[in-house]
């Protein structure tokens, strides 16, 4: 019962992670955030691997999934520090998120709750084929939305890591017990064959 509840809980957390990652992937695509898109793709693959390992009793897959979650927590911690401009990090260095391929920023910058976008005409700051906008009236600025999204990912990852370690430990213990029982049964099964063969041989020759 405990094993089943652990597996079911891990699958539930993996499904929540998958939904949250897909939701984040959509908005990162809309904002052309190529670095987060790549990280989200790897995370989705790792979560699918974790679900498969849980359902198929594969402890190695769960270990790989848990190892990825450590990297995923570190990445999301970096995202939080980046958008909140902790230390030397600054949003002006947005080439980190776009691999310096565009000037796009987070989709939430213009589409956040309550945001009003106003084009700034004849601005000297505008580059070629680009325009400057003014965003006002946001109920929650986009850096905080991105930080909250990353905090949710960290929360799910921490719980997933704990349950992945627990379930993989249960699977490893079961594999060891099955190997021991299987070896003992195979050894005990050969002895009756030899004795029965010795008992039947005289009966065959006398007939």
UniProtKB/Swiss-Prot annotation:
Signal in keyword set: yes
Superkingdom to which the source organism belongs: Eukaryota
Stretches of the chain found on the membrane's Extracellular side: 22-34, 83-146
GO biological process: regulation of sodium ion transport
Cytoplasmic-side segments: 56-61, 168-207
Pfam families: NKAIN (PF05640)
Location (main, coarse): membrane
This protein's GO CC annotations: plasma membrane
PANTHER family attached to this UniProt entry: SODIUM_POTASSIUM-TRANSPORTING ATPASE SUBUNIT BETA-1-INTERACTING PROTEIN 1 (PTHR13084:SF4), T-CELL LYMPHOMA BREAKPOINT-ASSOCIATED TARGET 1-RELATED (PTHR13084)
Family: Belongs to the NKAIN family.
Record protein name field: Sodium/potassium-transporting ATPase subunit beta-1-interacting protein 1
Lineage, broadest ranks: Eukaryota, Metazoa, Chordata, Craniata, Vertebrata
